[in-house]
Amino acid sequence: MRPSPSLASHARTCSSPPSSGSRITATRTAFRISLDKLGLDYLDLWLVHQPFNDYYGSWRAMEELVDAGLVRAIGVSNFYPDRYYDLVCHNRVVPAVNQLRLNPYDQRRDTREISARYGTVLQAWSPLGQGGAVLKDPVLVSIAREHGKSVPQVILRWLVQTGVSVVVKSVHEDRLRENIDIFDFALTHAQIDAINALDRRETGNGGPDHRDPAMLDFLRTFE
């Protein structure tokens, strides 16, 4: 038995042959390579990186890996509500996780609603807005001052307290410790409402919009 912590990885959906059969085979091969490199006998979580190319073929191969006990859970990343719902409707296993950009300025309420309906956990990447204007927002600064915490801690607490898992990147030990130190306080309902009101619906999110034909043409250059 492997001890904690749990390990997750992404299954890329670029750089692959176009047919479903080829995609299923390519996914199986990619999984074995990842497992060998990690020196493990199973993964806790494996994600489809983006809704592009034959991600249905990838998903069905991943379902087989779950059945075989080689992956404990499978999920998706960067899936908008329409792509997420389509995947749920036409496949056997519901994604355990949908990992996407989510922060006070980009709250993805439509995705949160449909994910909750099917029991998929939302996991926020870039929850601190990549250190941008959100960290200087006066509402967040005021709430942080009330609790004697930093703005990043308030944002992370808001996400966790409202049921969102978080992925926070840092190479500094002091910041890593700060990011973990969010369980000794709780936001009030009024404070949560104030943060919810900051949503700017910035769904362009600084990453690929897989509904944009121009972006899909760009992604094809990596195949």
Predicted regions and their residues:
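Short secondary-structure boundary/capping segments
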Residues: S6-A8, K37, R112-I114
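Beta/alpha (TIM)-barrel catalytic core signal, keyed to glycine-rich beta->alpha loops juxtaposed to Asp/Glu
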Residues: Q50-E223
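N-terminal binding-site loop/beta-alpha segment at the start of enzyme catalytic domains
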Residues: M1-C14, Q130, T221-E223
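CE4/NodB-like, metal-dependent polysaccharide N-deacetylase domain
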Residues: T27-V48, E64-A68, T120
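Solvent-exposed, non-membrane alpha-helical residues enriched in polar/charged side chains
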Residues: M1, P5, R32-L35, E63, ...
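Short, acidic/polar
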Residues: I24-G39, G57, Y84, Q107
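A short, structured active-site edge motif that brings together acidic residues
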Residues: R12-I24, D44-P51, N78, L102
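Active-site acidic short loop of glycosyltransferases
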Residues: A11, L40-D41, R92-V93
